[in-house]
Amino acid sequence: MSSASRVGTGSVDLLGLDEATWRPHALHAADRTWVETNCYIDVWTELLPALGHPPEAALPFTVRQDFEGDHFTFFKYPLEDLQALFGLSVQELAIYDSVEAHTLEQLGRGHPVLIEVDSHWLPDAGPTYRKGHVKTTVAAVAIDPAARRFGYFHNTGFHTLQGADYDGLFQPPGAPGMFPYCEFVKRDGPGLTDEALTKASLGLLKHHLALRPKANPVAAWRAALPQHLEKLAARDMD
């Protein structure tokens, strides 16, 4: 990954990616039974290889998925695993200015920014684009406020948006609503590679296996399913 490049006054393109030529990672291959997992897992699965790291090495945590009584674990890549494997320090971004201004500042420092946004303004969001309002997470890697253009990872790929979508995504200061949750990614080191990465990943697998659920999560879900179905059947599905 090259260092951040200024493409114009007040704009940053961190990775120099092209939406037309970006190819999703193999974990997001179209022939998979479940192409997408959840917004946070998916965005990291694309961001990691863009930063030069194999996401497969960070998957040991998945053995800890459990049935939590009312849902299956909404799992995420553990931040401590990303640090240990890839030298990535993920920190919460304290928002006091506009999200646009913070994104520009952090990208200028070489830090990708993960932002909770309204998928209403994401052209790649399919049926919810300009219709529904659903919270999701994107990873910002390029921004040009003057051109009102934004480059980001979301779900299974790299995308760009501009114009009215940019305006909607980055609401002006003082607009109603709360600040979104944001994180930025600092690269503390080059990360592990080759045999060292394999060894560290296997070590994490042993760690997570020791903490895996004591009972079968699918069996626990099966036992709770009749009660859940009864509640759902009594609700207005609209």
Predicted regions mapped to residue ranges:
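Noncatalytic regulatory segments and standalone regulatory/sensor domains
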Residues: 145-238
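Active-site-adjacent substructure of cysteine-protease-like catalytic cores
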Residues: 32-37, 42-69, 96-147, 151-154
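Alpha-helical structural motif
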Residues: 40-43, 75-78, 99, 197, ...
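Cysteine-nucleophile protease catalytic domains, especially the papain-like/related folds used
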Residues: 2-97
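Short alpha-helical interface elements
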Residues: 68, 72-73, 107-108, 128-132, ...
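Charged/polar, solvent-exposed surface patches and flexible loops
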Residues: 46-49, 81-85, 101-105, 168, ...
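Predominantly the structural core of cysteine protease catalytic domains
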Residues: 76-117, 191-199
